[in-house]
Amino acid sequence: MYIKKASLQNIRSISHFEMTFEQPAGWHVLIGDNGAGKSSVVRAFALALVGPKEALGLRSAWQEWLKNDKKEGTIKLEIEPSKEDKLTGSGRRGGLKIISNELVFKRINDNNVEFSEKNSSKQDSSKYNWGTGSGWFSVAYGPFRRFAGGNPDWNKVFYSQPKLGAHLSVFGEDVALTEAIDWLVKLNYLVLEQKEEGKILEYIKKLVNTADFLPHKAQLLNISSDGVVFKDGNGSKLPVNQLSDGFRSILSLTFELIRQLVRVYGNEDVFKEIAKDNMIIPLPGVVIIDEIDAHLHPSWQTRIGSWFTKYFPNIQFIVTTHSPLVCRACNKGSIWRLTAPGSDEESREITGIEKDRLIYGNILDAYGTELFGQSPIISKDSDSKLKRLGRLDMLAAFGNISKEEEKERIHLQHIFQTDV
């Protein structure tokens, strides 16, 4: 399945925001200042994907979701099914090409907000992605991605409410992706027992060890009852929990994504191409990631989207970021900007030359669009030094510069090579 259109009305700090996806599979980036509402958007999408029944497991205070002083707020997703998506119970999908997931928040009084599905006579969403039929793949990940350190009370949700568990970490920072490591260790036992499922470990190692994924030629070495071990760029062997924050952030996401794909589609469908040495997982679905750039070096930010879209070519990735480098992979996708708090501008899709600068331009071209705020490139001190360099250049041009000033001018030129 894919999200074709999404809209929010009076949700948290957002009065109105709408996204459309003409070509859903690909890399779709949401940018905006701190406090603009990026996390609110991706959480709203995740809430609508799991549905009102599963969402009760969040134990959320629904009054926090409705914008202050508003009587009603809505989240609406228009879902396009894929051939892999099956109905819950008896019946056929019929002529429905678009399925509507719509949630409504209604203020009862100052302290109470009612949360429910917005009724539609055209469909019963519990037969579609809110149901238990196979397919309908979606997951969501928050910015605090790690293997350990979460609240253990949430662990049982992954088993009792697997659909909610697949989206859980986007709703709070106290959720760790511990299930991914436990799953890998269990797969190792299947290897020892020479069971067919044990081949999954070989396929996962192939995928993670592709040359364009981990920096500095780091490699996944071994998965055993003792845990998951990597070899870093210096040749040292390290347990996965001792890797850097950036490594753990991306690896926990990747392992958990694969685990969820296997849960929904099964081993054979997930790895049938990799088993033939075609290194892709071509299944459809929606993957939401808040702050994909968290803890990543700029060089990794630049290529992370290209890696995910290369090896998961039919997934719709919706990610938030503060980095223009993450937008490099949006040649197959879209870029959206939430307006800054207090601004009169409208939130919108970034198109045309502005989009091209973010995808193809250098980092200064990207910041030059001012889509990431006004003049974030240099500090005030740097600006004053540039002005000083300009004055010294004028003196040099007219031959009125002293030796000390010329020495200062050369020093400033070395500092600001890209500006002179």
Question: Which residues does each PLM region occupy?
Answer:
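Amphipathic alpha-helical segments that form well-ordered structural scaffolds
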Residues: A44, A140, Y203-A211, W307, ...
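Extended helical coiled-coil dimerization/tether regions that scaffold
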Residues: P162-L283, K403, D419
